[in-house]
């Protein structure tokens, strides 16, 4: 197997050394260079061709956000994984990086020597980033595909549920910022994200959306016209008393919050009066819930492969045979709105 070539960007000598040591302990990864800031990286990209870049956000001369903008402006298609501090400013910067096109992020520990705990997670993300980039086949964006075997039959929608993972923040931004203020249903969202980051994520969406967006809290009564984002580290469910329930029950598919937990819970309450959407992400989370929602008479959507950062979760949902509509990301909000307003049959 050809080694994955990586450039490590960090202004700290210690962090660069620790990250390089972690990556080079893996036989399939080769660190071909390091950079002390964004400008240094841009100079190195003139002569080096990495497969993946790891990028610190808070750096002098040219920070992570400025670096991402510069790399994207050069039309260089290299997946970038950002290291984020867990400070409020760091989380806000992380959201900005994801919207600018960063492939994924890793929370940076407060103490450098705790970085080793994230070794497996970092290597996994680098492998996924590399495989997605090398397997890209430019293809036309297909229109909405309606599966002939599944008739859309739900009469009145009372809730929308959406799940996403890798690539989800940018995808959800495209969807939720299109929702109108008078969306006459509650919207529940699960985005795989570490503890602490979902508040910044929800705030960013709220600042740029007509509809209200907030991080969900345990026991609160959900309302129409509000988007509720599951907090990192908690499963989100809904109950028959119109309340949100957050739990620390064991992870599903290795994640918490899990899309399936939300989908299955919501299907029990809303029966046929629900529409679900599974967006970009790795793994199979959301596939079981999609099947249950369809079996109960709800309407199901999965994102088209052509627009996914990772066609994992939408593929698993599609392969259940229970997906009504396969939709490119730019059309997902429009389709949901049509269904909620009874314009899609």
Swiss-Prot record:
Residues 5-123 form the Response regulatory domain. The modification 4-aspartylphosphate is found at residue 56. Pfam families: CheB_methylest (PF01339), Response_reg (PF00072). Disulfide bonds: none annotated. One of its GO terms (cellular component) is cytoplasm. The keyword Nucleotide-binding does not apply. It is found in: Cytoplasm. Its EC number is 3.1.1.61, 3.5.1.44. It is an enzyme of class 3 (hydrolase). Phosphorylated by CheA. Phosphorylation of the N-terminal regulatory domain activates the methylesterase activity. Contains a C-terminal catalytic domain, and an N-terminal region which modulates catalytic activity. Belongs to the CheB family. This is Protein-glutamate methylesterase/protein-glutamine glutaminase. It comes from Clostridium acetobutylicum (strain ATCC 824 / DSM 792 / JCM 1419 / IAM 19013 / LMG 5710 / NBRC 13948 / NRRL B-527 / VKM B-1787 / 2291 / W). The lineage of its organism: Bacteria, Bacillati, Bacillota, Clostridia, Eubacteriales. The gene is cheB.
């Amino acid at each position: 197997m050809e080694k994955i070539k990586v450039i490590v960007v960090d202004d700290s000598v210690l962090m660069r050394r620790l990250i390089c040591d972690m990556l080079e302990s893996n036989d399939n990864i080769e660190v071909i260079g390091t950079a002390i800031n964004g400008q240094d990286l841009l100079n190195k990209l003139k002569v080096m061709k990495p497969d993946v870049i790891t990028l610190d956000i808070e750096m002098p001369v040219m920070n992570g956000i400025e670096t991402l903008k510069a790399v994207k402006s050069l039309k260089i298609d290299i997946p970038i994984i950002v290291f984020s501090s867990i400070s409020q400013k760091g989380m806000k910067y992380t959201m900005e990086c994801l919207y600018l096109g960063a492939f994924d992020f890793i929370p940076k520990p407060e103490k450098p020597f705790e970085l080793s705990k994230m070794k497996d997670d970092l290597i996994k993300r680098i492998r996924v980033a590399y495989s997605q980039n090398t397997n890209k086949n430019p293809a036309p964006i297909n229109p909405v595909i309606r599966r002939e075997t599944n008739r859309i039959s739900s009469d009145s929608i009372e809730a929308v549920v959406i799940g996403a993972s890798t690539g989800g923040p940018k995808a959800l931004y495209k969807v939720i910022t299109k929702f109108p203020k008078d969306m006459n249903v509650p919207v529940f969202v699960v985005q795989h994200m570490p503890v602490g980051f979902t508040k910044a994520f929800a705030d960013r969406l709220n600042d740029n959306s007509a509809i209200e967006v907030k991080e969900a809290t345990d026991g609160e009564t959900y309302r129409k016209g509000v988007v509720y984002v599951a907090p990192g580290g908690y499963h989100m469910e809904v109950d028959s008393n119109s309340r949100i329930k957050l739990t620390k029950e064991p992870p599903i598919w290795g994640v918490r919050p899990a899309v399936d937990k939300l989908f299955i819970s919501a299907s029990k309450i809303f029966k046929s009066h629900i529409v679900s959407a599974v967006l970009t992400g790795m793994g199979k989370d959301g596939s079981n819930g999609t099947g249950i929602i369809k079996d109960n008479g709800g309407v199901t959507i999965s994102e088209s492969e052509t627009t996914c950062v990772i066609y994992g979760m939408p593929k698993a949902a599609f392969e259940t045979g229970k997906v009504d509509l396969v939709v490119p990301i730019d059309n997902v909000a429009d389709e949901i709105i049509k269904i909620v307003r009874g314009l899609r049959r």
